[in-house]
Amino acid sequence: MTNLSQTFKDFFIHCTQDPEYKHEIQRKLFHILTIAWLPIAYIFLAKKTMLYIIYPMAILVIATDFYRHKNIFIGKVFHFAFGHILRESEFEENSWTGATFMAISAVIVFTICPKTIAICAFFILAVSDCLAALVGKKMTSKEFFEKSVAGSTAFGISALIILILCGIFNHEGLAYYFFGIFAVFATTIIEARPSFLDLDDNLTIPLVFSSIMMFFGLVWSLNY
């Protein structure tokens, strides 16, 4: 047990001493905090109430992201607050941050999809996407499309766990798990090969997962 604890301690120290990886940890912690509250809130709130929250939030996020390029004051405040977690590409003129794509996907998924699917999709975005990045960047493994075997494995396994937990919590039937496994597999492939759709993963991950679940739900007349 002591050796195991020391191993994790050494790994943590090594990670935090790597500037690039430390930056990624900061990004992903922010990623989890800004996304996970959505499915958590939806567990306790009605759909109508949730949409009253999401729509103004999406407008605020998109407007801020747009005007940071147009207004010097907004740009300075934005980059002072969030500059340390942005990627280099997000500093470019007329670029959009991941928050904008997350806001767009939240509006679409929470408006159209049943509660269980929306909750599951955004827990996968918050947790699985984070694990894929952190594990994939730190653990040496073979390539899997444009990512790594380690990162994609972390994504797929964590997404399956989320799928199962959401299903148990909402008392879903076997069809949910059967089609959910297929949706998780497809989403893992899309996450590992972003050039296939060439869109931000804050958009593709929840939309691909929920679209597949909705498709099977409509074809087989399922009520998730």
Annotated model-derived regions:
Residues 2-53, 65-169, 174-224:
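Interhelical loop and helix-boundary elements at the membrane-water interface
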Residues 56-59:
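Aromatic-rich transmembrane-lumenal/periplasmic boundary elements in polytopic membrane proteins
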